[in-house]
Regions:
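C-terminal amphipathic alpha-helical interaction region
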Residues: 185-253
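Internal glycine-rich alpha/beta core junctions
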Residues: 1-199
Length: 253
């Protein structure tokens, strides 16, 4: 597309375009994480409704042990993500506070990296719950599956998010202090979170050239590995989510 004789207005200082864009980029990255989470919730709703109605071997699917375990794991992932995203939203709402500003700066790219990456296999799992019909357009899930990759790509792909997290940790000492304080507050409550924090500490002690840039956000976003890590989300969002919504912390050790 070409524009002839178009007129524009300079926003910010000349040569400072990237910095101006990045001021907006944090919110749009947060939006990507929220969008992926919403699509995952919709996929889970479709799968759960099907499991409640569909019968196999004399019982509804939801009553079959393996299906109950699968749906429970999917629900844990979603509850953990919800808690984390609420906590991140609070940080964005209170950016005038220095601590909350660092919280938003550090965890926004980590959230985009982890949640957007988790979306594609999550929807694929929901499709399997429905069986063959889950692959057909009538089920709605193929549309959700096609929609998923875009949130991982725009506003910065996975590598960009990883580099951004490393940049924050290396250039803002307050970010590492905040992360240590957050983990100390919930130490001993979940072994998966404790292990992820120990691994991340060891990673950051290595020389910069030995650090895997993608390892750091994966450690920071340790929930990325599966349902047993959902409490890592819940721990981050514990102060905003009421007790009856904190299923991950009660049911996963």
């Amino acid at each position: 597309m070409e524009f002839y004789e178009a007129c524009g207005w300079l926003v910010g200082d000349e040569g400072d375009g990237v910095r101006q864009i990045l001021r907006m980029g944090g919110l749009t990255r947060f939006d990507c994480a929220l969008g992926s989470h919403a699509l995952m919730r919709r996929a889970f709703s479709v799968a759960l409704y099907h499991a409640l109605q569909r019968q196999a071997f004399g019982k509804n699917l939801v009553e079959q042990p393996m299906m109950r375990q699968l749906l429970g794991q999917m629900a844990l992932r979603l509850e953990g993500q919800t808690a984390f995203l609420f906590r991140l939203a609070r940080a964005w709402d209170h950016r005038d506070d220095a601590r909350e500003s660092v919280w938003a700066r550090l965890f926004t790219p980590a959230a985009k990296f982890a949640i957007c990456k988790a979306g594609i296999p999550f929807v694929a799992e929901a499709m399997e719950v429905l069986g063959g019909i889950g692959y057909c357009e009538e089920s709605e899930l193929p549309r959700l599956y096609r929609e998923m990759p875009v949130n991982s790509i725009w506003e910065g792909s996975g590598n960009i998010m990883c580099l951004d997290v490393m940049r924050v940790l290396s250039k803002q000492p307050a970010a590492m202090e905040l992360l240590a304080a957050e983990c100390a507050e919930v130490k001993g409550q979940n072994r998966h979170l404790d292990r992820a924090w120990r691994q991340l500490q060891q990673l950051l002690k290595r020389p910069a050239e030995e650090q895997g840039e993608r390892d750091c956000p994966a450690g920071l976003s340790s929930w990325r590995g599966g349902a047993d890590a959902a409490p890592c989300f819940a721990a981050a969002g514990r102060s905003l989510v009421p007790d009856d919504a904190r299923h991950p912390r009660r049911h996963t050790s």
